[in-house]
Regions:
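PP2C/PPM-type serine/threonine phosphatase catalytic domain
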Residues: 1-195
Length: 195
């Protein structure tokens, strides 16, 4: 299976600064093509969100260049334990660095992150915040869960999906990288099905 990758970020209609950052790469393994991508959205309500998102992208790009050859098992699938451990440690480290930068400079900053590695067999996603990953077939399938107040209330049965769509609190994040002492990345693993 061959992969086609493409990416774009947009400032949107309300912001004055594009706080999004993106890195994508396609590479060859002994089992065929694979893809690594990471997308971050700097916190729109916080100062210097573009600094936070760019620093996370830079760190994940460096991780990919140094570790991508170890990311796959002997059958061409993703080495789930290795990648999860590496990404978890990287996010914890980045969270602390961004927090310290903010304290030192007297600014509030943070970013969401969604990173994915896709092999010929499966995918692994890490997510913090509300940046989403979808599978595109004949329709869209959400692969991640938003870490927002409204999403939590839907999960707990306090709100319906319909109520959540119009809730003014839908953009209140429970998690982002750099804004709080603790960060709780969520991982999503699944199989890849060729067309």
């Amino acid at each position: 299976m061959d992969f086609a990758i493409s990416g774009v970020t947009d400032i949107g209609i309300k912001k004055t600064t594009n706080q999004d950052s993106l890195f994508m790469c396609k590479f060859q393994t002994s089992f065929g093509e694979a893809v690594f991508s990471v997308l971050c959205d700097g916190m729109g309500g916080l100062e210097k969100g573009e600094v936070a998102s760019a620093s996370v992208i830079t760190a994940f790009e460096k991780w990919a260049k140094e570790n991508i050859s170890f990311a796959f098992d002997n059958n061409g699938g993703i080495n789930n334990d290795f990648v999860r451990s590496q990404w978890n440690d990287l996010i914890f480290s980045l969270n602390e660095k961004i927090r310290l930068f903010g304290r030192k400079n007297g600014v509030s900053l943070g970013t969401t992150i969604t990173a994915i590695i896709i092999s010929q067999k499966n995918y692994l996603i890490v997510n913090v915040g509300d940046t989403r990953a979808y599978a595109v077939t004949d329709s869209l399938y959400l692969l991640t869960k938003d870490q927002t107040l409204v999403a939590k209330e839907v999960e707990e049965g306090k709100l319906t999906e319909e109520q959540a769509e119009n809730d003014p609190r839908r953009s209140i994040l429970l998690q982002c990288v750099g804004a709080s002492e603790k960060v709780y990345p969520e991982f999503f693993f699944g199989d890849v099905y060729p067309d």
